């Protein structure tokens, strides 16, 4: 069951993340950061998973990062939040290393800004989904947003045939 699935802590840390990458003009960097972060938050909330956002302090940022948010989902089993995604703005640091430039007639050549967002880490999303939609009878509630992909069913019911 879910307890056995979650108990194998390796599942939480499987690295099969789905990243969103943006290369943009410096003046669009803040707007893209907000969009990327909101994509992750909206995805989890659409599945009835409570999330919060932690802004990483400058001392915790990796070398190239200018700004970073961690998105955390609530774990009813552990009674705490755990990280399910991360959104980072690297400013022009990564573009400088990779020599990614923008050509502009007005401003000449300048370095682009790069951003990345771990929008989905499937194992961690599965844990958050199951824990937050598990019912007392052992069934799993299907959030409204997923029902059209599930043939309209609103619950997954355990099979009692053993």
Model-derived segments and their meaning:
Residues 12-162:
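TRNA-recognition modules of translation machinery and tRNA-sensing kinases, especially anticodon-binding
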Residues 1-15:
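Single conserved hydrophobic/aromatic residue that forms the stacking wall/gate
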């Amino acid at each position: 069951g879910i307890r056995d699935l979650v108990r194998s802590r390796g599942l939480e840390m499987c690295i099969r993340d789905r990243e969103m990458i943006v290369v943009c003009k410096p003046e669009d960097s803040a707007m893209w950061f907000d969009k990327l972060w909101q994509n992750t938050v909206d995805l989890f909330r659409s599945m009835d998973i409570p999330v919060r956002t932690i802004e990483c302090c400058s001392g915790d940022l990796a070398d190239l990062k200018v700004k970073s948010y961690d998105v955390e989902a609530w774990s009813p089993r552990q009674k705490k939040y755990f990280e399910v995604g991360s959104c980072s703005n690297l400013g022009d640091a990564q573009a400088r290393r990779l020599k990614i430039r923008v050509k502009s007639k007005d401003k000449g050549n300048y370095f682009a800004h790069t951003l990345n967002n771990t929008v989905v880490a499937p194992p961690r999303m599965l844990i958050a989904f199951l824990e937050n939609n598990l019912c007392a009878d052992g069934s799993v509630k299907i959030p409204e947003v997923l029902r059209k992909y599930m043939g309209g069913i609103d619950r997954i019911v355990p099979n009692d045939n053993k």
